Amino acid sequence: MASKRKSTTPCMVRTSQVVEQDVLEEADRAKDKGLGVPPSDVSKERWAAEPEPSSKESEVVEVRSVGESQSKKLQGGYECKYCPYSTQNLNEFTEHVDMQHPNVILNPLYVCAECNFTTKKYDSLSDHNSKFHPGETNFKLKLIKRNNQTVLEQSIEATNHVVSITASAPGSSDNDPGVSVGKTATVKTGKQKADAKKVPKKPDEAAPDNHMEGTARLVTDTAEILSRLGSVELLHDSLGHVMPSVQLPPNINLVPKVPVPLNTTKYNSALDTNATMINSFNKFPYPTQAELSWLTAASKHPEEHIRIWFATQRLKHGISWSPEEVEEARKKMFNGTIQSVPPTITVLPAQLTPTKVSQPILQTALPCQILGQPSLVLTQVTSGSTAVSCSPITLAVAGVTNHGQKRPLVTPQAAPEPKRPHIAQVPEPPPKVANTPLTPASDRKKTKLQIAHLKASFLQSQFPDDAEVYRLIEVTGLARSEIKKWFSDHRYRCQRGIVHITSESLAKDQMAITGTRHGRTYHVYPDFAAQKFKEKSQGQLKTLEDSFLKSSFPTQAEVERLRVETKLSRREIDSWFSERRKLRDSMEQAVLDSMGSGKKGSDVVAPNGALSRLDQLSGAQLAGPLPSPSSAVVQNQEQVHLLRSTFARTQWPTPQEYDQLAAKTGLVRTEIVRWFKENRCLLKTGTLSWLEQYQRHHLSDDHGHDVASRRATKHVAESPKNGSEVAHQYAKDPKALGEEESEKLVPRVKLVGDPSKDCLAGKPSEATSDRSEGSRDGQGSEENEESGIVDFVEVTVGEEDAISEKWGSWSQRVAEGTVERADSDSDSTPAEAGQA
């Protein structure tokens, strides 16, 4: 028989049988019957031979004739031992087992932890146990998942007996001092005990009474268990209203199914993995009629099935509330006043009657149900004292009465009348953020403070690690999925250019939040009478100035740090920063006035009605709810001034210059690059009216320092008369210029249209680099071309070809009055760059 199981059919083991197995007896039965799964007891054989529609949960193996199985194996392929399915494709067979039989393990690996013995066959493990562990009965099988491989690790219990909640196994007897429990506490009903009194004489007599006999056996076994737990110390603290926690554990396939004694044909096991049903049960275990109607439409299952499923879940988790308790718990839940209970273990024995259980068993609690980690063990020591070892979970063991009562009656000696003694609940931590509405995560809108925390973290890293996510969960009170979704959305928006999160915008958001909650927030350092600004010490002023140099809009953490160091109030710090920004604004305005600019940076509008992105950003920030709007304008004016000054010097900054601008302005590097690109495009259309002013200011600053170098580096100087006349003539009519006049332009040509522009020849090296940078953008000295004035052209010997092409392109642009990119720019750029 063993050779037949070595065919192409993979070895399959049900996980529900891994919990408790008497390995020796089951090995013998496996050899006798020739099945890949060890059977349980005599009653299971009888039920497998005559299956009933109402006992599907109790069926484990379907017995087939030997001839049928042999005929299928002769054809080749794979057959399922739990249903008539067969196929010749291994992938289809594996998919069938995973979908239809989730509790079946394919090709497990058996490991003996005592001897380091490893095998893939159950028969080999049985032979190993009979040879090396003769007479041993306390075997434990532990299920482990390793790299898509299911490992069943066998160990031997070192000592005495362990309290169990399973029905009597094949290897246990009535005189055992205890019943063994496995990795997961299970309640197996629907099985008859393998003694002569319980097994009926005829097969047809067993079918009608199997459920009632099994339930009676459940009650008697519970009485036996609770009688052995008499020495356990009872905890008299009554439990409060605690919501059930029905979250899917990672080992969902290992959780045993609870058989329903009543109406098993109506119980739909497909609802056990329905996320909608589980979420609804997590919210409240007693659904209203409206919720039942909604669940009926959402899950596409009959309402009667949903009612039975909810009743079964309450039965499974030991929940049985009176109507008054249901209303009270519902009010507390929606008022946000549910308090969690400390982890306790409560064993509450009750009076039991050995008679048969009446019909409404769904309204009573199971004898025992363990939630949380499935490694809780109650060990009964032979000395008489009972040691309780468990993980920090809440466990309640309540007796079951069979008088049709809604809640079990508890003896006064056991506990002083607890209101609801049969709740099994894992306490949840209290919510971090108070008054959180009980709405779906997608419907909740984030507050400004939550968005500020998220933006601050987004600036540090667009892909936060787990530690940062947990910190954001504690700070914002948002769920992990909400935080992940927010980061994903903003990464997409930043890549598309929809939003731009900068340090300045974050600082302004935090300032706005601080300003809105000043009147209702209590701080660690209360604000007393404000000091006068003149009374600040030198140390305080130095600390404030250092912070101002870093950022003119301090963050919340920076303000708290300044309060600790300077001993000033929050109002004083905010006022000082506001006054300091106003002082800086006035100085900036004075600089702009000295440059002859009567316009503000945010008011510069292009002739075609277009604004640069940075100007639009500054205009948008004007409308923000900031304490001092003028400070935001001047802050942007300072940034715009630095960018424009750099643009007047060179329109193609180097990477080092981009880094310097990012450090000086506080803007993101990508924003600066985009600003330069847009302004170069505007320069081609002739809409940069501010460029001439900034270039004049830049050249006037360089004029005083470069007079000597200008005289020293001047090689050939044409007279103003000749140079001016030839250049103006060439600008008016290039074709009329003869060869002699064009040769005069080769050594040195200087056109003077404005006496104040003589300083342009002051720094030849820098002027040449500026022209090379300008030629890359194809515009030359465009600010003067808009007014129709050409300041100068400096030419050295050896550049005749390049300069002639450049002069041709310039003359065409001057004549047409527009700024276009000439084809000769690509040729002139290398020549000028090499000369520079």
UniProtKB/Swiss-Prot annotation:
Residue span of region Disordered: 24-58, 168-210, 404-442, 700-836
PROSITE patterns xrefs: HOMEOBOX_2, ZINC_FINGER_C2H2_2
Major location category of this protein: nucleus
Pfam families: Homeodomain (PF00046), zf_C2H2_ZHX (PF18387)
Mapped zinc finger ranges (C2H2-type): 78-101, 110-133
Region (Required for interaction with NFYA), start-end ranges: 263-497
Chain spans, region Interaction with EFNB1: 27-77
Zinc-finger found in the keyword field: yes
Family: Belongs to the ZHX family.
UniProt function note: Acts as a transcriptional repressor. Represses the promoter activity of the CDC25C gene stimulated by NFYA. May play a role in retinal development where it regulates the composition of bipolar cell populations, by promoting differentiation of bipolar OFF-type cells. In the brain, may promote maintenance and suppress differentiation of neural progenitor cells in the developing cortex.
Protein name stated in the entry: Zinc fingers and homeoboxes protein 2
Organism of this sequence: Rattus norvegicus
Taxonomic lineage of the native organism: Eukaryota, Metazoa, Chordata, Craniata, Vertebrata
